[in-house]
């Protein structure tokens, strides 16, 4: 079968190759991947900066954001049936008793990222216990479930932390970034009735800006406009340290900033002491969030349906490019105006 692979640690080793077909063991399912989303983590792996092949393999099959059809069942599987549409979660625990999304580094494997093959292949396998069923009517947008699950966990942490301390949900939110995660965060917050301001570097006539405004949010062009005001909740979805700091500065007293990005190492920031003192005196909270649990995937599917029905098909407009498997290389190169690029493995 064909699969999109890399040699972890070797830059620009991306290729489409023939690999052996996997066979499901007890408790596993054989999947027929249909659509696979591409994200910044894939780019890091392709550049040789991250990723680990499964034990005994010299290559890693990419693809951790997937919509698939169940092709065959391993022994003992009874929670799904052949032909079901499903989304597999990403992470699998290794000797970790915590919820899988809270397992520390070294205590988990991740499909298409770390120690487990992904789903950018004509067939893949995963554990049946980590599958979420997808309604047929969400087939065209369910590939957004995994990135949205990350948002769901982050928003849950932010909103529940705010409510636990101040007794009511946040009314205003600042979303830093208008890529897939930023726009999905804006979508979820809009569905929750929170007033949104989103900041990114694209101009006001860009698709990203128009999508924020379509949600009823205010868009700030960070290149030409100054961000002002205070916000109850900040969702940082860029991975830029300077914006994470700006988010902390813009928190209202008692506010919560949720960090969803992965940041490059930097030196000490100017004015850091004053910023931290302000955080103490105003009871500000900063929380990091990574990965997601099954309930976040389930909530993501519910929000995709709600947004599709009530926001005039908004989720579909986040998918800006669909690339067939034969032209796989095009899926891993995107422009500033692309939002979610998807690899169509098969129809």
From Swiss-Prot:
Subunit structure: Homodimer.
UniProt-listed Enzyme Commission number(s): 1.1.1.47
Influence of temperature on activity: Highly thermostable with a half-life of inactivation of 10 minutes at 103 degrees Celsius.
Family: Belongs to the zinc-containing alcohol dehydrogenase family. Glucose 1-dehydrogenase subfamily.
Residues involved in substrate binding: 41, 110, 146, 291
NADP recorded as keyword: yes
Catalytic activity: D-glucose + NAD(+) = D-glucono-1,5-lactone + NADH + H(+); D-glucose + NADP(+) = D-glucono-1,5-lactone + NADPH + H(+)
Its biological purpose: Catalyzes the NAD(P)(+)-dependent oxidation of D-glucose to D-gluconate via gluconolactone. To a lesser extent, is also active with xylose as substrate, but mannose, arabinose, galactose, fructose 6-phosphate, glucose 6-phosphate, glycerinaldehyde 3-phosphate, ribose, sorbitol, ethanol, erythritol, or lactose are not oxidized by the enzyme. Can utilize both NAD(+) and NADP(+) as electron acceptor, with a marked preference for NADP(+). Is involved in the degradation of glucose through a non-phosphorylative variant of the Entner-Doudoroff pathway.
Xref: Pfam families: ADH_N, Glu_dehyd_C
Key words of the record: Carbohydrate metabolism, Metal-binding, NAD, NADP, Nucleotide-binding, Oxidoreductase, Zinc
Example GO biological process: non-phosphorylated glucose catabolic process
Positions bound to NADP(+): 178-181, 260-262, 289-291
CDD domains per record: glucose_DH (cd08230)
Molecular-function GO terms, alphabetical: D-glucose binding; glucose 1-dehydrogenase (NAD+) activity; glucose 1-dehydrogenase (NADP+) activity; glucose 1-dehydrogenase [NAD(P)+] activity; NAD+ binding; NADP+ binding; protein homodimerization activity; xylose binding
Cofactor(s) demanded: Zn(2+)
Binding site for Zn(2+): 39, 64-65, 146
Protein name, entry field: Glucose 1-dehydrogenase
Organism superkingdom: Archaea
Stored InterPro entries: ADH-like_N, Glc_1-DH_arc, Glu_dehyd_C, GroES-like_sf, NAD(P)-bd_dom_sf
Keyword Transcription carried by entry: no
